[in-house]
Design a protein with these regions (language model features):
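Sec-dependent N-terminal signal peptides
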Residues: 3-15
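Extracellular/lumen-exposed scaffold segments
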Residues: 18-188
Length: 188
């Protein structure tokens, strides 16, 4: 009996940590996670792309600097659905003298906002085609594609802690004490 219970618990946790869509390439892995297991009509949902690189490798920011290319994402959406993003976090400086580039070492998390129409089908697919560049001493193009079906089963979405971490890493706080009003005149 204990053995059966152990198997059930192991199966639950293996499904609990499974990503919706994973794309493995030579020096990196892309995971695609939805905000929740359910996407409702007339709502905004967060879809998250996580790119993890092998140790010592990096990928590029939207403005890569002197060299490199940012990741590109092509979405296949049902009729009436719209997607915006990614919401880029602040990059790290990646010097490669005499060049200066901007990007992310080891991992980057990129949220997208999916807007749904007032009426959505009971079942639908979201397709993703991704291209990104990973570099160490040389750069290697990475790519992959796939689809996820909604509603889907046996897949866990992001936890509240993971969502909080994504928002913390991508949305910068502004210190309003550093700003000063120098004129109350209207600007034209």
């Amino acid at each position: 009996m204990k053995f059966k219970f152990f198997i059930l618990i192991s199966l639950f946790f293996s499904l609990h940590t499974q990503a919706t869509l994973s794309i493995n390439d030579s020096n990196s892995k892309l995971n695609f996670y939805p905000e929740s297991n359910e996407i409702n009509a007339n709502s905004e949902n967060i879809l998250t792309i996580e790119i993890s690189m092998d140790k010592g490798w990096h990928t590029y920011w939207i403005n890569p600097g002197d060299s490199g290319d940012p990741a590109e994402f092509e979405w296949e959406l049902p009729e009436g659905f719209q997607i915006s993003g990614p919401i880029w976090p602040s990059p790290d400086k990646i010097p490669f003298p005499p060049l200066m580039t901007y990007g992310f070492d080891d991992q980057v998390i990129l949220p997208f906002i999916l807007k749904t129409p007032k009426i959505i089908p009971k079942q639908f697919e979201i397709g993703l085609k991704a291209n990104w560049l990973v570099c160490k001493e040389i750069c290697i193009p990475q790519s992959g594609s796939g689809k996820i079906k909604f509603p889907y089963q046996n897949v866990n979405a992001l936890s509240n802690d993971q969502l909080k971490e994504i928002k913390t890493r991508t949305i910068q706080k502004i210190n309003l004490k550093k700003f000063k009003v120098i004129s109350d005149k209207n600007f034209e």
